Design a protein with these regions (language model features):
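Conserved pre-motif I regulatory segment
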Residues: 175-213
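Metal-dependent nuclease catalytic cores that hydrolyze phosphodiester bonds in DNA/RNA
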Residues: 1-83
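Mg2+/Mn2+-dependent nuclease catalytic core
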Residues: 60-155
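Conserved helicase motor "Helicase C" RecA-like lobe of SF1/SF2 P-loop NTPases
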Residues: 680-705
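Walker A/P-loop
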Residues: 208-229
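Conserved RecA-like P-loop NTPase helicase motor core
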Residues: 642-652, 707-832
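A substrate-engagement module of RecA-like helicase motors
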Residues: 179, 238-347, 352-355, 413-440, ...
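A contiguous, basic/glycine-rich beta-loop/short-helix subdomain that forms a polymer-engagement track
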Residues: 325-347, 357-365, 527-644, 649-654, ...
Length: 873
């Protein structure tokens, strides 16, 4: 069987035919709309007659000496009418269609590809192409037509294939090299207990095209145990690309280190770490246009040379390598990285590259079809709250008022005059009414025919356009005034909601608000498209509001029974309306269907059925509990039965007893400890008491602050890492004479920056104390979640409070014992941990927990250290 190189029609034309500058001033709103126009596609397709075929799959195969190039895609529509064939390419946009004088070249090229493929298949001598642009808000439609002879299309298309041939040759040759190396690749270590079975579970899941949920305790080697079998599956054509997605930067580095290790063992595999635009941008401000950024100017003229140079020299596309080549070729490093991902075998990045409805990688997932991809989701317990966040949308009343003030203050009358002159100059001429026949009868709207640049253009007024404020789309008041009026209408609706809100309130119908919001969105879009002389500050603020509004309207269209709409009065006095995605299951599942298989893993996936349910798992998907490889004798877990963090029992006496517990635990062994508290306020109370009554000269305390920059965080952690290379066994073996003289105690907050994702090995951390059960603070969203899941037949308190809280506890406890050589203690300070409702959530390796009191804990700790020392002799 000949090898294949596959590419979509869209990727082919965008990659080969692009040129010029990056310019988000004109591309931003239009391109975002193009990706969000699925509703428009369906609407137009439904209105067409029987002669209209929607979503027609087309494929072209081009043989070479060694392999075949397959170009494939879906034509939005094919119209067979009166013996003629028309290829319909639909594009949604927020732009005023009266100002769209010609279709975009890349859109024409995409339609021409479909026209050639269909003509070749049906042996048509000529064919018509129609570009259908539809305004998403008003549903106005503008058609552009062009007729092509097959012979002309063939010459054009074959030149396109010829230009792509260099890239296809490289892709095929690299794939052959990669597959051969995968076949010879062996697991780089001796398998730990249970690790071989875990590797097998991952491979079988990919084979069966399922999802796998893995509870993987620290030390299992979850990164290599998921990446290795996925790479082996790719060697059997069960995956073209591996996506390793995580919420934290440090785990992305671990994934790249794993690929590097496998490359050292002979694997030929190109990997890339995708970095956020704000972090990798060379400029102080991310102004992506040729006037503000030299890397944006002419970017598309140079980018393909940069890609080919790096591709043929490197296998690991790290941030530093991307920046090096971006500087060499003067291209945008962010867009450079995205383009390189098309040629990478492994793509490492944030969750949002797959799951975020606005940021996902459209070059892979934009056409809605399933790719031959495998998704590895690390620290997947974080995906639940991230999923809720990505698929929810707030709207603050104060944002509208602030924008209104700014519009009045900063947009000058001269700008309005210039805009009016431009509108007058571009006024509509040469219009004539056209009586519609045939398929047009499906669209009983106002029709106008125009001739522009020699191309037939048809304008159709949409139903929603007629429902506006009675003003023609062609004649507008000043933009600033129009924006101000619409902001006032929106604010009036929000003010009415605010009067009815006491704390927070669930709401049902917000259509009266959405209508002016939709119009406001369209007017801002027009303004951003037309005004080239807006100050940077005004444009930046307008764009920021515009994208927030885009997100809100998109989520409004998306909402279903998994959403709750509510208003609330915020602590800072502001008023907010929120579309709250209480259950992200369906949205996340839809994203995972973009690939062949998904492996989700975490050290704190308990209870696993809870996560499987809310993260899009099905009954036929798998779950597995990986066996812990650590020696249980190297750890002791103690539960206090005489203190609690319950709000109803908080008192100076309770705070004192908790501070005393800390003292009784740390006094038996000098070393590094972290104490985790339910809140900053609680932590500060305990710290003050500890400092006053218990702190000794041999102890030093570090206290987490509410806002710590990266430098302060690193300082905090580096104080603990000072002894990372020390051998704890030898230190303890020296007993009293050589024992560490200093104790370092970190006072931290549960669920904060030090409670998850930090790796303190060996003597860097020998003890963790967790104060409280980690229950989230009672608030409107937690109560909404509780009520929703109670109504859904689940335990609302568990889903909203207990499970999220326990996850934070397990994450904090997991900061100690990071390697097989580590020794340490875990102390849980809350009597609720002795209840079954919490004990049932303990991981299997926590079977041997011991109850203590403030009077007995010191003896228990001393016995543990002495017993371990005696055992090691």
């Amino acid at each position: 069987m000949a090898g294949e190189v596959r590419i979509s029609v869209r990727n082919l034309v965008e990659f080969i035919l692009r040129s010029g500058d990056i310019d988000d001033r004109r591309q931003g709103s239009l391109e975002n709309a193009m990706q969000e126009g699925s509703r428009i596609h369906r609407m137009i397709q439904r209105r067409m007659g029987a002669e209209y075929q929607a979503e027609v799959a087309l494929k072209y195969t081009h043989p070479t000496e060694d392999y075949v190039i397959i170009v494939e895609g879906r034509a939005d529509g094919i119209i067979e009418q009166n013996g003629e064939t028309t290829i319909d390419e639909i594009k949604g946009t927020y732009r005023d269609l009266s100002k769209l004088k010609a279709p975009l070249p890349l859109h024409i090229a995409q339609a021409k590809c479909y026209a050639y493929m269909y003509s070749l298949q049906k042996e048509l001598p000529y064919i018509r192409v129609r570009l259908t642009y539809c305004n998403i808000e008003t549903e106005d439609i503008r058609y552009f037509y062009e007729d092509y002879e097959f012979v002309r299309l063939e010459v054009w298309f074959q030149q396109l294939i010829s230009d792509y041939r260099k890239w296809a040759d490289y892709t095929w040759q690299w794939r052959e090299l990669r597959q051969q190396s995968i076949a010879e690749l062996q697991f780089p270590f001796d398998y730990r207990d249970g690790q071989k079975e875990l590797v097998s579970y991952v491979y079988q899941t990919i084979y069966h095209k399922r999802k796998l949920f893995i509870e993987a305790p620290t030390g299992v080697g979850k990164t290599i145990s998921t990446i290795f079998p996925t790479v082996k599956a790719m060697g059997k054509d069960m995956g073209d690309k591996l996506f390793y997605l995580t919420a934290k930067t440090i785990t992305r580095t671990v994934a790249e280190d794993t690929f590097s290790l496998l490359r050292e063992k002979g694997l030929r595999f190109k990997s890339i770490i995708l970095t956020a635009k704000e972090k990798i941008c060379f400029q102080e401000r991310t102004e992506c246009n040729p006037e503000q950024c030299p890397y944006a100017k002419g970017h598309f003229d140079r980018i393909n040379d940069a890609i080919y140079d790096l591709l043929t020299r490197e296998e690991s596309f790290t941030r530093s390598k991307i920046e090096e080549y971006a500087l060499k070729y003067r291209v945008c490093p962010f867009e450079f990285g995205l383009d390189l991902s098309l040629f990478a075998d492994g793509i490492i990045g944030d969750y949002n590259y797959l799951f975020d409805p606005h940021v996902y990688l459209k070059r892979f997932f934009g056409d809605g079809s399933q790719g031959n991809y495998v998704f590895l989701i690390d620290e997947a317990h974080n995906l639940l709250e991230r999923g809720r966040e990505m698929y929810s949308a707030p709207l603050r009343k104060e944002d509208l008022l602030e924008l209104k003030r700014e519009i009045k203050q900063t947009i000058t009358s001269e700008m309005e005059e210039a805009a009016q002159k431009k509108r007058d100059k571009d006024g509509i001429s040469g219009q004539m009414t056209l009586e519609m026949t045939g398929m047009s009868k499906q669209l009983p709207q106002e029709i106008t025919l125009e001739e522009t640049d020699g191309t037939d253009s048809l304008y159709v007024r949409g139903h929603k356009g007629k429902k506006s404020d009675g003003k023609s789309t062609f004649v507008r008041e000043g933009y600033a005034e129009r924006i101000s009026q619409l902001l006032e209408k929106c604010n009036a609706q929000l003010l009415s909601m605010k009067r009815d809100c006491d704390g927070y309130r669930l709401v049902d119908d917000i259509d009266m608000l959405v209508q002016p919001l939709t119009r406001l969105h369209a007017v801002i879009s027009d303004y951003l498209e037309e005004q080239e002389k807006i100050s940077l500050e005004v444009r930046e603020n307008l764009l920021d509001f515009y994208f927030k509004l885009s997100h809100f309207l998109d989520i409004y269209e998306r909402q279903d029974e998994n959403y709750v709409k509510y208003t609330r009065l915020c602590e800072d006095g502001s008023f907010e309306l929120k579309l709250f995605c209480v259950n992200p299951r369906e949205n996340l599942k839809e994203c995972m269907l973009r690939g062949r298989s998904t492996i989700l893993f975490s050290a704190t996936f308990l209870p696993i059925q809870y996560y499987k349910n809310l993260l899009g798992g099905e009954k036929e998907d798998y779950e597995v509990y990986a066996h812990s490889v650590f020696d249980p004798e190297k750890r002791t877990i103690l539960i206090a039965g005489d203190v609690t963090s319950k709000f109803s029992r908080r008192s100076q006496e309770e705070y004192y007893n908790i501070a005393r517990y800390i003292h009784e635990v740390v006094k038996n062994r000098h070393g590094n400890y972290m104490i985790f508290f339910p809140s900053y306020s609680f932590m500060n109370h305990i710290y003050e008491i500890y400092e006053q009554y218990f702190m000794t000269e041999e102890e030093e305390c570090l206290v987490q602050q509410e806002s710590m920059n990266e430098e302060e965080r690193e300082y905090f952690l580096n104080r603990f890492r000072g002894n990372e290379e020390c051998d704890l066994q030898s230190l303890i073996g020296m007993e009293i004479e050589e024992e560490e003289e200093q104790t370092l105690i970190g006072f931290c907050v549960l669920g904060g920056i030090f409670g998850e994702g930090i790796d303190l090995k060996r003597d860097s951390l020998i003890g963790v104390i967790v104060v409280g059960t980690g229950l989230p603070q009672v608030g409107c969203e937690r109560e909404i979640l509780k009520g929703y899941f109670d109504e859904d037949g689940e335990n609302g308190f568990d889903y909203s409070y207990r499970y999220p809280g326990m996850n934070k506890v397990l994450q904090a406890a997991g900061r100690v014992i990071r390697t097989a050589e580590d020794v340490g203690i875990i102390v849980l300070l809350d009597d609720r941990f002795q209840q079954y409702s919490y004990r049932r959530l303990f991981p299997r390796e926590w079977e041997q927990v011991q109850p203590v009191t403030v009077d007995t804990v010191a003896k228990k700790v001393e016995r543990f250290w002495d017993a371990w020392l005696w055992q090691k002799g």
